[in-house]
């Protein structure tokens, strides 16, 4: 009997260690991500300020470096006001459903060779499935607010996200054909051999479609009709305040970094060095992801907001046909002597 008790205690201790280690790894991923989100807002204000010949944040800390911390403290101190006609439970559930997929998707993102929380073979499929759930948070937030502005913004956002997910999915089919794997680490390893081996070159139209569709997916300018200030105040989160509003903000920027990271992994060689004489590593992943994020901010500073009908037309009549044509072209070329150019 004593032996059985000791064995059970040993199993419990092993289970506890496994759970504790998993929680440590999750925190090691989430904490830097939240810091990255905070300082992406700072970078956005600084970079767009520089493009518009302004200074940007410069009051809190050296060169305004503590501005994100000040913003977080301000939002934490504000009251979360629930409108009188709102559905209380769904109103609170909306931000949770928005942030959860944005964080959960990071479980399968590899930062370097072997540096990944969960290296699963269906990583690409997992990311596509989990990120598509973010739209439920948007719809619930808009509907539960009991506001016409919020509901209109939610409907716009939901239609836009669903429309551009199709183009993004087709773009990923091209990557899947080239790498012949759904494992994100294997997709990166398939681009080994320098910058000339990146999938950016044979799949360039799919790269452009994926990048622009990613901007639309995250409701960023110039595709931010869901929160068009001049038309419907602030979109689906118009009734939110305090930390509930901040959670939507975090979800948007976490999704931005996620799209940039996926673009890096699938088209720009991930953590692989572009030249043979420099070693691979997480530094390359950070530099490439930072470059894609810079493009996101550059788009915002450059382009005016599109009309809703223009956004829908671009998604359905331009991007989806381009991706289908290029997938057929790549599939056909793979059956010819030039097929090695697409692997």
Curated annotation (Swiss-Prot):
Subunit structure and binding partners: NDH-1 is composed of 14 different subunits. Subunits NuoA, H, J, K, L, M, N constitute the membrane sector of the complex.
One GO CC term, this protein: plasma membrane
Membrane topology reported for the UniProt record: Multi-pass membrane protein
HAMAP family: NDH1_NuoH
Spans through the membrane: 19-39, 89-109, 124-144, 158-178, 198-218, 257-277, 279-299, 314-334
Top enzyme class: translocase
Nucleus among keywords: no
Recorded GO MF terms: NADH dehydrogenase activity; oxidoreductase activity, acting on NAD(P)H, quinone or similar compound as acceptor; quinone binding
Major place of residence: membrane
Top-rank lineage group of the source organism: Bacteria
This enzyme's EC code(s): 7.1.1.-
Cell compartments where the protein resides: Cell inner membrane
Name used for this protein in its record: NADH-quinone oxidoreductase subunit H
Assigned keywords, A-Z: Cell inner membrane, Cell membrane, Membrane, NAD, Quinone, Translocase, Transmembrane, Transmembrane helix, Ubiquinone
UniProt-listed GO biological process terms: aerobic respiration
Keyword Transmembrane helix among record annotations: yes
Swiss-Prot/TrEMBL catalytic activity: a quinone + NADH + 5 H(+)(in) = a quinol + NAD(+) + 4 H(+)(out)
Native species: Thiobacillus denitrificans (strain ATCC 25259 / T1)
PANTHER family: NADH DEHYDROGENASE SUBUNIT 1, NADH-UBIQUINONE OXIDOREDUCTASE CHAIN 1
Pfam family, one: NADHdh
Family: Belongs to the complex I subunit 1 family.
